[in-house]
Amino acid sequence: MASEPASATTTVAVPDEARDRARELGWEDGLIDAALARGFSLQEVWQALRAGVDGATARSFLESGQRGPQPDLRWMTVPTEWGIRARPSDPAMGLTIGDINVGTYGDVPDTWPHRSEIARGSYPKPAMEDMGYTIFDKAVVWADCVVPLYEQAIRDRWAPATDLRWASLEALPEDVERAVSQLMTELSERSYHQGVELGRWLPEISYGFLEAKLFLSTVIFDLARHTEAFRKRALVNGGAVGLQAPTDYMRAVTEARSYPELLATLFIQDSTLLTLYRNGDRFAQSQLERDLFALAARDRERLLQYQVQRLKHYLFRHPERRDEQHIYFTKAENRVGKEWADPAVSGPLALLLAGGRERIAGGLTALREFRRQQVAEYQAHLAAATIPRERLGGRLWAIVKPADA
């Protein structure tokens, strides 16, 4: 609140210590009283004294007629691109992040030059703190599709609490409910773990690649939603959360030492889970589960599109890193192959494919065919990313190889 000017009839008692401090600083006698008469408060005088303002500066300031410090308006003249008038390219979509990528603000450099949290297009200060970013290479994280995918993601909202008809579930045979609960336990855990790992890497990506960071934030939210929805299904129909999912593959994800290694390791899970969700009606025991798989598939489709386009762009910019990616794929495939052989992973799917415990042998045969479908689609997605892969990791190949191979 601004200080009120002292009136002519108001006497302000100036403490002796204030006058003593003024003399130490070279204030001539009467300068404090002159400042008070000019309308400055005793508190403002004290602030000047404590700040060490000398007498000459104080006298000059009073003689200038200024009531207070003048604002520094140099921020109004920084040489950023002025006169931008972004407009929606599609009125139905509104003003998108793509629409504001105009002029220099839409230029995403191949290498981001700043280590601070400067926004793209801002004018940098002479010196700023290093904020700890480690990813400055656009090719590592970028795909042009992140811009439209972000817009799709923020519009494709669904809430497990209200968009799934939980009250519609009916009791299932115990063996079937146990299989559903175990599958949902695994899917919830995998969603949670992937969201945690992506969240761990998000702060490493420089602010200059804002659109990629925005899209990845929607992926993390999608995975949190999947964690919630699958866990709810395990606990809503008389079942329970089942046995912990195997962690060999999750460990490989956690051990990734770079963002390209992380995404290469996640590629097989992103692809095979998308195939699972798209074929959810083969495992679903209710309309709610069909709806749940369909909604989860929509989210996973966006993530896999980013995976394919990012890897394609990365290999175009860094062809020398192609062989390295195969190392990561082999490691991930072997971990997945080991987990697919785990009874806690294969058993529930086989039972659900068969329709019951007594027919599980036929379900195991059907599951082997489904695994082949998952792997074939995984290979197709890699081919779309310009890195075809005919030779698979041995443990994965053992699951899907033909009987006569």
What are these regions (language model features)?
Residues 251-257, 269, 279, 308-333:
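Extended amphipathic alpha-helical segments with heptad-repeat/coiled-coil character used for oligomerization
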Residues 2-11, 28, 36-39, 46-50, ...:
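Terminal targeting/low-complexity segments that flank the catalytic cores of oxidoreductases
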Residues 220, 249-270, 274-286, 291-294:
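Eukaryote-skewed repeat-based solenoidal scaffolds used as protein-protein interaction platforms
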Residues 136-158, 220-243, 308-315:
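Conserved alpha-helical segments that form or flank metal/cofactor-binding pockets of metalloenzymes
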Residues 202-206, 281-284, 314:
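Secondary-structure edge/capping motif, primarily at the C-terminal ends of alpha-helices
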Residues 194-254:
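Long, hydrophobic, well-ordered secondary-structure blocks that form the structural core
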Residues 187-195, 216-234, 263-274, 293-311:
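Alpha-helical transition-metal enzyme core signature, strongest for iron centers
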Residues 213-217, 291-294, 323, 327:
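Short, charged, amphipathic alpha-helical segments
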